[in-house]
Amino acid sequence: MLAFTLRFIKNKRYLATLAGALVIIAGLTSQHAWSGNGLPQINGKALAALAKQHPVVVLFRHAERCDRSDNTCLSDSTGITVNGAQNARALGKAFSADIQNYNLYSSNTVRTIQSATWFSAGRSLTVDKKMMDCGSGIYASINTLLKKSQNKNIVIFTHNHCLTYIAKNKRGVKFDPDYLNALVMHAENGKLFLDGEFVPG
């Protein structure tokens, strides 16, 4: 009888431990979703929380290209479409709901400049041609912008090959960004860390 009671108690403890572990796992899964490409998904709330700890760097691919679409061009044929501009504006409004304080940069192409302008709705934009050149030197260029921004959060409009390079170099994953997709990085002690993919919402 005593042996049966001890086994019963142990089984109850095991079940309680198992139930607790499942609750923790479920909680982590709901708070830290993962993209199919292997990158953690970071929404606006998570980004805001990260920005309270370190300066964040959000790198967006430009909006829909006019020269690769049948949609109406915003203006210049080397820029973005009207649809792309509207999407950039909507994304900017959603982004600013969580991150109000940031400096804005773009590469020196019409499509990135237009994307950044519509995203920010009037915020001052600095154009930096180094945001077009993506390779090992991209990190030094980003750190230079952080210093210029006095370690404020920064938003950069750049190109798909830049985002692909960073994802592969920092996390060893293949990232093929669509228009207006973004990566989130943070700076700590002079080093840049890739946190994941920005997912609005």
Curated annotation (Swiss-Prot):
Residue ranges crossing the lipid bilayer per the database entry: none
EC number annotated for this UniProt entry: 3.1.3.-
Record keywords: Hydrolase, Periplasm, Signal
Source organism superkingdom: Bacteria
Location in the cell: Periplasm
One Pfam assignment: His_Phos_1
A GO BP entry: lipopolysaccharide metabolic process
Pathway: Bacterial outer membrane biogenesis; lipopolysaccharide metabolism
GO annotations of cellular component type: periplasmic space
Single GO term (MF): phosphatase activity
Function (record text): Catalyzes the dephosphorylation of heptose(II) of the outer membrane lipopolysaccharide core.
NCBIfam families associated with the record: PRK15416.1
Family (UniProt): Belongs to the phosphoglycerate mutase family. Ais subfamily.
Protein name: Lipopolysaccharide core heptose(II)-phosphate phosphatase
Originating species: Salmonella newport (strain SL254)
Encoding gene per record: ais
